[in-house]
């Protein structure tokens, strides 16, 4: 009789522990989702800014090229314009990559990635 009560008490404790682990997992998933969602939104905004920056860097490069061909710009200044354009292209690729990583993480957490596997 004492063993039976102890077993019942232990079973209740195990049920409570399982419930707590489930709640902890749910809270952790919600926090992860919230963090990835905010990172995704930030990366989307950054991507927009980098796209604008790329347009400006491209225009700057075109102007520099015209000036270089006219002899009004040194080779070093032309290389700086080229480097600026390459840096802008690299930043936009990095922003696209980071945005996609967040998107994949959101799909994974929400279970949406399973649609891509079917």
What is each of the regions a protein language model found here?
Residues 1-62:
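Sec/SRP-type N-terminal targeting helices
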Residues 9, 75-83:
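Short, charged, amphipathic alpha-helical segments
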Residues 12, 82, 89:
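Conserved catalytic core of two-component sensor histidine kinases
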Residues 14, 77, 98:
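Acidic donor-binding helix in nucleotide-sugar-dependent glycosyltransferases
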Residues 40, 78-79, 95:
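Amphipathic alpha-helical coiled-coil/helical-bundle segments that mediate oligomerization/assembly
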Residues 91-118:
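Acidic, low-complexity, intrinsically disordered peripheral segments
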């Amino acid at each position: 009789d004492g063993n039976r009560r102890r077993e019942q008490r232990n079973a209740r404790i195990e049920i409570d522990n399982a419930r707590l682990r489930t709640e902890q997992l749910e809270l952790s998933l919600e926090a992860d989702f919230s963090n990835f969602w905010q990172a995704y939104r930030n990366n989307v905004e950054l991507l927009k800014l980098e796209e604008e920056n790329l347009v400006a860097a491209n225009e700057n490069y075109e102007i520099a090229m015209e000036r270089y061909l006219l002899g009004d710009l040194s080779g070093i200044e032309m290389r700086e314009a080229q480097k600026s354009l390459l840096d802008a292209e690299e930043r936009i690729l990095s922003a696209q990559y980071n945005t996609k990583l967040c998107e994949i993480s959101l799909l994974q957490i929400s279970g949406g990635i399973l649609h891509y596997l079917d």
